[in-house]
UniProtKB/Swiss-Prot annotation:
InterPro entries: Plasmid_pXO2-34. It comes from the Bacteria. This is Uncharacterized protein pXO2-34/BXB0033/GBAA_pXO2_0033. Keywords: Plasmid.
Length: 100
């Protein structure tokens, strides 16, 4: 799966609101953790670790989630610190500044 990247010169991240477990299960496809694991979100409420080939309940891993991506590979939620809140984000196009 190809992950979509936005240029920092043309787009910016805008924080909208906090993401809970229900929203994560409905919108997310892939989750990255602070220790470098990439997990896939399953329909039954679990996360699947492809490297370890095991299922982990989302309630056990929710505090360790760093970023959440949808099926297109676009980041839809992000956390800056391990003790922070998981916040929903959207990419906004930056307005062009007029040169004087």
């Amino acid at each position: 799966m190809r992950e979509k990247e936005f240029s920092k010169s043309t787009h910016r991240l805008k924080v909208t609101k906090e993401m809970d477990i229900g929203t994560l299960l409905n919108r997310a496809h892939k989750v990255s953790t602070f220790d470098g694991k990439n997990l896939i979100v399953l329909d039954n409420g679990n996360l699947y670790d492809q490297a370890g080939r095991r299922e982990v309940p989302v309630t056990n891993m929710f505090r360790y989630i760093k970023s959440v991506r949808n099926s297109d590979g676009i980041v839809i939620a992000k956390k800056n610190k391990p003790c922070g809140k998981l916040m929903q984000v959207i990419f906004e196009r930056k307005a062009k500044q007029k040169v004087k």
